[in-house]
A protein has these predicted regions:
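Internal, conserved structured core segments that host functional sites
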Residues: 56, 61, 65-137
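A short glycine/serine-rich beta->alpha loop
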Residues: 4-14, 43-49, 83-90, 117-123, ...
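Flexible, glycine/charged-enriched surface loops at secondary-structure junctions
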Residues: 36, 111-117, 168-170
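A contiguous pocket-lining binding segment that forms or flanks enzyme active sites
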Residues: 122-170
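Electropositive phosphate-/nucleotide-binding environments in soluble metabolic enzymes
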Residues: 17, 33, 37, 53, ...
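Glycine/small-residue-rich interface belts in oligomeric ring/scaffold proteins
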Residues: 4-69
Length: 170
């Protein structure tokens, strides 16, 4: 199954995630993150209490809505997902990554329903967890596998940013 093979490489999926740090630079500038231990704690806190947690909840809800073919609720949840980040920069990150994922998945692993779903999604503003949830649901990837891959990608991108910023070595 293509998705199962790709889960281990999910953090490298072509969404431009390497260009974003989810606010890690600001955390460094404010002295919150200054090395390996504080980076791990920062990532843990983000997973438990930050936007990745909100993303995981939204991913699960969108997944289940898509499985039920409830496109009216999908439209409402997709619009709600645009409002869940606490900072406009995080929303922008999620939109750029979501749109990139949606374009890549539509061309590399198409599904007959993707075209009709387009009218229920915010035009050019598909946040990342929404795009992942729809693709996973339509291709019958288990929701738990999808959630784990999504969150693993967040952590891997955070570690990559930590290396780039000199917080940890390679």
């Amino acid at each position: 199954e293509p998705w199962a093979q790709g889960i281990k490489d999910f953090s490298g999926f072509p969404v431009g995630g390497f260009a974003y740090s989810h606010g890690l630079e600001a955390a460094m500038d404010n002295g919150i993150v200054d090395g390996k231990n504080s980076l791990m704690e920062w990532l843990r806190g983000a997973l438990l209490f930050g936007s990745p947690n909100n993303d995981a909840i939204m991913l699960k809800e969108i997944y289940e809505t898509t499985i039920r073919n409830d496109y009216v609720s999908l439209k409402e949840l997709s619009s709600l997902a645009l409002t869940l980040n606490v900072a406009s920069e995080l929303t922008d990150e999620s939109i750029v990554q979501g749109n990139a994922f949606w374009r890549a998945i539509r061309s590399s692993w198409p599904h007959n329903d993707f075209s009709c779903l387009q009218e229920y999604l915010p035009k050019n503003k598909i946040v990342y967890p929404v795009a992942v949830a729809i693709a996973a649901a339509k291709h019958e990837v288990p929701v738990l596998s999808s959630l784990l891959a999504y969150l693993q990608a967040f952590v891997m991108n955070g570690i990559s940013a930590g290396i780039r910023l000199g917080l940890i070595g390679q």
